Amino acid sequence: MKITVIGAGSWGTALALHFSQHGNRVSLWTRNADQVRQMQEARENKRGLPGFSFPETLEVCADLADALKDSGLVLIVTSVAGLRSSAELLKQYGAGHLPVLAACKGFEQDTGLLTFQVLKEVLPDNKKIGVLSGPSFAQELAKQLPCAVVLASENQEWIEELVPQLNTTVMRLYGSTDVIGVAVGGAVKNVMAIATGLSDGLEYGLNARAALVTRGLAEITRLASAMGAQPKTMMGLAGIGDLILTCTGALSRNRRVGLGLAEGKELHQVLVEIGHVSEGVSTIEEVFNTACKYQIDMPITQTLLQLIRKEMTPQQVVERLMERSARFE
């Protein structure tokens, strides 16, 4: 199958590498013309994922029309902020009918829409829209280390066709029709990873980390259920699986944000040092607004938002959570 990957960050590049190494032709495209030239010349993404050479089956395209030609699937792997404009480009290039998966995680700022909802709004006639989510770091996938992720869509027939087409010995795929649950799990776990990074950076120990992960899962489940998701989805790869990896893994950008804030650094300084997008930071406010809309109590999210707004110190965040009134779990 010909696959088009839009977005050449670390995750987009890792997915392009993976699928091109497992029987697919892949075209990789990004808006950044300088990055396109660099990748074409070096046959490697030295900016986003250095150290991994591109196989012959991976084509880097300067023209989106070339990238979309004969494509059977589009993966949009931009930041959430770039998702809508990428979907609009598909329409502009006459490719709005192509099957499309959002492989980014978060809520769109200002609208509060989940990734698949953005795609549905921009491409209302497209019946093959979904998300790819689950516990997976770009570096490990590029090294062909095993992982398992979820493909979710409201279109069950399409997912049943797509899963065996994309399933490999490196990336095991599971299908789901609970696209809300899969999308919410992927979005909100980034917020919880900032909290665990904060706790780890303050050296509060493994007990505190376990408590934050567990209560974070409770917050995610409450919100997802209120939005129409199946609670059992939160017990799977797109829920607790992604949460554990992002909250504990050394490669987690969002956890690194928490670690940096615990050191007393300004948020903008932390983000510059990381050098990549942290969806957790841009998602916090929309998660909190959505929780308010559904009248869901999300204390971890709320206190983190106060931290980002400089209304609390890192120490006060943890203290506030521990001082909450006693209650039954």
UniProtKB/Swiss-Prot annotation:
Which amino acid positions bind sn-glycerol 3-phosphate, per UniProt? K105, G134, S136, K189, D242, S252, R253, N254
Pfam families recorded for this chain?
A: NAD_Gly3P_dh_C, NAD_Gly3P_dh_N
Q: Which reaction does it catalyse?
A: sn-glycerol 3-phosphate + NAD(+) = dihydroxyacetone phosphate + NADH + H(+); sn-glycerol 3-phosphate + NADP(+) = dihydroxyacetone phosphate + NADPH + H(+)
Matches recorded under InterPro entries: 6-PGluconate_DH-like_C_sf, 6PGD_dom2, G3P_DH_NAD-dep, G3P_DH_NAD-dep_C, G3P_DH_NAD-dep_N, NAD(P)-bd_dom_sf
Localisation? Cytoplasm
Q: Name one GO cellular component term.
A: cytosol
**Record has GTP-binding as a keyword:** no
Record: active site = K189 (proton acceptor)
Query: Which top-rank group of organisms is this from?
Result: Bacteria
EC identifiers of the protein: 1.1.1.94
Keywords (A to Z) from UniProt: Cytoplasm, Lipid biosynthesis, Lipid metabolism, NAD, NADP, Nucleotide-binding, Oxidoreductase, Phospholipid biosynthesis, Phospholipid metabolism
Residues involved in NADPH binding: S10, W11, R31, K105, A138, R253, V277, E279
Q: Which GO terms describe its molecular function?
A: glycerol-3-phosphate dehydrogenase [NAD(P)+] activity; NAD binding
Q: Tell me the route in metabolism or biology where this protein functions.
A: Membrane lipid metabolism; glycerophospholipid metabolism
Q: Which GO terms describe its biological process?
A: carbohydrate metabolic process; glycerol-3-phosphate biosynthetic process; glycerol-3-phosphate catabolic process; glycerol-3-phosphate metabolic process; glycerophospholipid metabolic process; phospholipid biosynthetic process
Similarity comment: family membership: Belongs to the NAD-dependent glycerol-3-phosphate dehydrogenase family.
| NCBIfam families reported in the protein's UniProt record | PRK00094.1-2 (NF000940), PRK00094.1-4 (NF000942)
Note the HAMAP family from the entry. NAD_Glyc3P_dehydrog (MF_00394)
Q: What does this protein do?
A: Catalyzes the reduction of the glycolytic intermediate dihydroxyacetone phosphate (DHAP) to sn-glycerol 3-phosphate (G3P), the key precursor for phospholipid synthesis.
Q: Kindly give the PANTHER family that the UniProt entry links to this protein.
A: GLYCEROL-3-PHOSPHATE DEHYDROGENASE (PTHR11728), GLYCEROL-3-PHOSPHATE DEHYDROGENASE [NAD(+)] 2, CHLOROPLASTIC (PTHR11728:SF1)
Q: What is this protein called?
A: Glycerol-3-phosphate dehydrogenase [NAD(P)+]
Gene name, please? gpsA
